[in-house]
């Protein structure tokens, strides 16, 4: 029995703007149990959005600092809320608490839902290169059959949701019809809350990386699990 003890979870938006914090908090609270005390933060320094490897690497040291801070503040886990997982491995080296990245976690969960996986993010050119490479790093190069993105800037994703949804549907249908994708992974935290509607239209599982990772973080906290850690 898990009991009623409160566990602290931090969802870290690894960007220097707080425009995503309230939206993220609203959605994650819907799926978490009352035993989880969740907080959402962004960085005080770093890129305003992560749309390139440069942005990812620029954010990484600030992410590590926030993870160290969260550990000292008594958090039981941190979710790095960007599909590129900036600073994930370094954060695990310096922290004894659970640290999950939404990219790695959502791809792992996708393997349980279907064999042929498609990743649809923002920025088609970057996504095609970055997420095929990521699939290789995770040993999923035979599972990820399609990676692309909608050409809408991250900070513009919530300005016209109908346009965003149409673009996502077009890419997803291409992945399904031309590449036989069986599960779609949304490759950006800015697409939070759209997976259920997309799944109903497409008829295949659509993974919301933030919600899947937050839900898994709760389960892992309660089970007393955390990542293997070592200090170099």
What residue spans do the PLM features occupy?
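Glycine-rich, highly charged phosphate/nucleotide-binding loops
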Residues: 53-73, 163-171
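Active-site rim beta-loop-alpha module in soluble metabolic enzymes
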Residues: 123-126, 132-187
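Short beta-strand segments enriched in small/hydrophobic residues
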Residues: 2-21, 117-121
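Short, glycine-/small-residue-rich phosphate/pyrophosphate-handling segment
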Residues: 19, 111-149, 219-232
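Short, acidic/small-residue loops that bind anionic groups at enzyme active sites
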Residues: 92-113, 198-214
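Beta-alpha junction/loop-to-helix N-cap segments that form part of ligand/metal-binding clefts
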Residues: 60-90, 94, 188-192
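N-terminal beta-loop-helix "entrance" segment that forms/cooperates
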Residues: 41-61, 155-161
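Hydrophobic alpha-helical
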Residues: 80, 84-87, 169-201, 213-214
């Amino acid at each position: 029995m898990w009991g009623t003890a409160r566990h602290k979870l931090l969802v870290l938006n690894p960007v220097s703007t707080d425009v995503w914090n309230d939206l993220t908090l609203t959605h994650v609270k819907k799926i978490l149990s009352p035993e989880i005390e969740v907080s959402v933060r962004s960085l005080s320094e770093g890129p305003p959005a992560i749309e390139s490897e440069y942005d990812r690497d620029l954010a990484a040291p600030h992410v590590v600092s926030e993870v160290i801070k969260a550990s000292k503040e008594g958090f039981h886990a941190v979710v790095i809320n960007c599909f590129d997982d900036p600073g994930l491995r370094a954060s695990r080296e310096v922290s004894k608490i659970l640290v999950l990245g939404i990219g790695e976690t959502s791809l792992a969960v996708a393997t349980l839902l279907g064999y042929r996986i498609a990743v649809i993010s923002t920025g088609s050119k970057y996504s095609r290169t970055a997420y095929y490479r990521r699939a290789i790093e995770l040993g999923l190069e035979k599972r990820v059959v399609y990676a692309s993105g909608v050409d809408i800037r991250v900070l513009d994703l919530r300005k016209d949701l109908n346009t965003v949804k149409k673009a996502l549907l077009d890419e997803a249908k291409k992945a399904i019809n031309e590449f036989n994708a069986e599960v779609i992974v949304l490759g950006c935290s800015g697409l939070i809350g759209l997976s259920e509607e997309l799944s109903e239209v497409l008829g295949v599982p659509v993974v919301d990386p933030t919600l899947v990772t937050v839900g898994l973080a709760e389960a892992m906290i309660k089970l007393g699990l955390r990542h293997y850690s070592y200090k170099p």
